[in-house]
């Protein structure tokens, strides 16, 4: 039996409102699936899922605003949830679709929940990984969880997070992938270098 040929991953850009988003896409099925990455990641986080899902669907994995090759608006106000949701709506328009299945992880899952709550008509299916429904997260919040979520507040500070992350050749980024992975060794040295390269992409 011959192995199935690997599907091609194609790169492109979509102008959505005031920003330009880089994305990769795979497959050509009728149903659109949008994959939203977490923090501090980019489309590469979905590299294993893209060719598998692409056998049945048209799969799109954007670099969300502020990440890798997408535009990086300078103000904190440029990253409010309304604008992040609008970016996903812009992707739907770019691909000429009125609905999509959304698969999202971490920070991207927060955006996906907001999209589904505010625009349920555009979400055919939703798979949110690692982030519960916002109301459930709020109602079950504990001090221990709040302490573990320190980074969400830290990375909203001006300038300090950039200095912290870039010190010693982005050693902190290295640690984030090596020490927080559920499965030790899940990220190869090559993977981590690719993630570091994405972090240093200019604005």
Question: Where are the model-predicted features located?
Answer:
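Structural cue for short, hydrophobic secondary-structure segments
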Residues: 35-38, 61
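Active-site machinery of serine-nucleophile hydrolases
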Residues: 54-63
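Alpha-helical segments within the soluble intracellular
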Residues: 53-54, 93
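Flexible "cap/lid" subdomain of the alpha/beta-hydrolase fold that forms the substrate-access gate
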Residues: 1-12, 18-21, 26, 32, ...
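The serine-hydrolase catalytic nucleophile loop
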Residues: 39-50
């Amino acid at each position: 039996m011959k192995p199935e040929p690997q599907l091609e991953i194609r790169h492109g850009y979509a102008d959505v409102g005031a920003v330009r988003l880089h994305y990769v896409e795979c497959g050509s099925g009728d149903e659109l699936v949008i994959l939203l990455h977490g923090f501090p990641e980019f489309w590469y986080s979905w590299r294993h899922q893209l060719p598998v899902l692409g056998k049945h669907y048209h799969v799109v994995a954007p670099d969300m605003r502020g990440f890798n090759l997408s535009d990086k608006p300078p103000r904190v106000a440029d990253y409010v949830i309304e604008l992040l949701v609008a970016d996903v709506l812009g992707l739907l328009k770019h691909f000429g679709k009125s609905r999509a299945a959304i698969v999202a992880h971490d920070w991207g899952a927060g955006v996906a929940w907001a999209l589904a709550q505010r625009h349920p008509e555009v979400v055919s299916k939703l798979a949110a990984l690692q982030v519960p429904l916002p109301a459930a997260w709020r109602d079950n919040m504990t001090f221990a969880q709040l302490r573990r979520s320190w980074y969400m507040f830290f990375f909203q500070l001006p300038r300090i997070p950039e200095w912290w992350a870039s010190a010693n050749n982005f050693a902190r980024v290295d640690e984030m992938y090596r020490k927080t992975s559920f499965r030790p060794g899940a990220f190869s040295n090559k993977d981590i270098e690719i993630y570091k390269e994405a972090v240093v992409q200019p604005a």
